[in-house]
């Protein structure tokens, strides 16, 4: 403020060049180092953070009253070309299975069924890459949300030895929603090992 004069402390803390506000700041710093206690100045509480602790709502911290979002991600592939005897979906129209799980953070991917079950409500990203090898038939692969085909991809060039049906999508899911791949047309005999299926949680809702 214009014309305002600094206030000085009486006694031993009085110094011609030491304004009151600097003395209070110095005292507050000393109290914070000793006991990390709040500093009370004119009825306002100044919270002293603990050293090395992330501030709430800042980088590495969640907002007050909220838990950090869970980490959810999976990636699965085939370890061999042909379906083992006794498995369903052995090259004919049906569910596409993946027997080798590379990542399953959050435990949402079920290897037995080849499907992902959403553990939390949120927006998820999914990607699949399904290959046909030495196969002149058209292959159609659909990504299924429960029983609904969301997107489909095709591999239909008869003149190439290897071709992939590949696509990706973002989906809002509720807990318990199931996402899987289904072979809607053609067969994958000989090309299983080059196929993959992956997904992850982008953010919770």
From Swiss-Prot:
Q: Which ranges carry the C1q domain?
A: 67-205
Biological process, per Gene Ontology: maintenance of synapse structure
Q: An example Gene Ontology cellular component term from the record? A: synapse
Q: Which residues are reported to be glycosylated?
A: 90
The answer, when asked if Zinc is one of the entry's keywords, is no
Signal peptide range equals 1-32
- Protein name as catalogued: Cerebellin-3
Q: Which organism is it from?
A: Homo sapiens (Human)
Q: What is the lineage of its organism?
A: Eukaryota, Metazoa, Chordata, Craniata, Vertebrata
Tell me the name of the encoding gene.
Answer: CBLN3
